[in-house]
Amino acid sequence: MDNNNNKKLFNTHGSAFDDSKIYFRDVDCGVLCFNIHNEQSFNNLNHWMSLFNENVPFVLIGTKSDIERTEKSISKERIEQWCKQIEDQGIVKEKIHYFETSAKLSTNIIEAYETIVKIALNQYKNKQKNSINISIEPEKPKGICWW
């Protein structure tokens, strides 16, 4: 296996890549983020999930955990129900990892990133195991004199 593989993170901001499945083709880990205080942000998760190929492992990140939850915030129970529903429907091949993060307080940022990298590397290794490497070496000329 090539030890020098590249991992790329795309931050779509919900716009430039919208409905462009080409950017999500052959990904090793999907990362979906939403604001835990914004209903529309949470509701958009289904749309973003639909852009990925089936059986892509996912990490779900709820942002702005430094802000106190209100009655309008998305409850942890509701988030867990959403994850379970996606898992039960077979849309993902393994359990969705969920982190509540705060960029302001640096809460769970490193833990989430390490999980994303671990999942992506495992997925990459599995793809390498299941692939066939075909290489054809060019034939050397025979019986030709070069002056």
From Swiss-Prot:
GO CC, one annotated term: lysosome
| Membrane topology, from the record | Lipid-anchor
Lipidated residue numbers (S-geranylgeranyl cysteine): C145
**Which InterPro entries does this one have?**
P-loop_NTPase (IPR027417), Small_GTPase (IPR001806)
Keyword set, alphabetical order: Cell membrane, GTP-binding, Lipoprotein, Membrane, Nucleotide-binding, Prenylation
Q: Which SUPFAM superfamilies match?
A: P-loop containing nucleoside triphosphate hydrolases
Q: Which amino acid positions bind GTP, per UniProt?
A: N11, T12, H13, G14, S15, T63, K64, S65, D66
- For whether the record's keyword set contains Kinase, the answer is no
A Gene Ontology biological process in which this protein takes part is: phagosome-lysosome fusion
Keyword match Lipoprotein: yes
What GO MF terms are annotated?
Answer: GTP binding; GTPase activity
Major place of localization?
A: membrane
Cell compartments where the protein resides = Cell membrane
Q: Which PROSITE patterns match?
A: RAB (PS51419)
Show the Pfam families listed in the entry. Ras
Instruction: Return the similarity comment.
Output: Belongs to the small GTPase superfamily. Rab family.
* Protein name (record): Ras-related protein RabK2
**Source organism of this protein record:** Dictyostelium discoideum
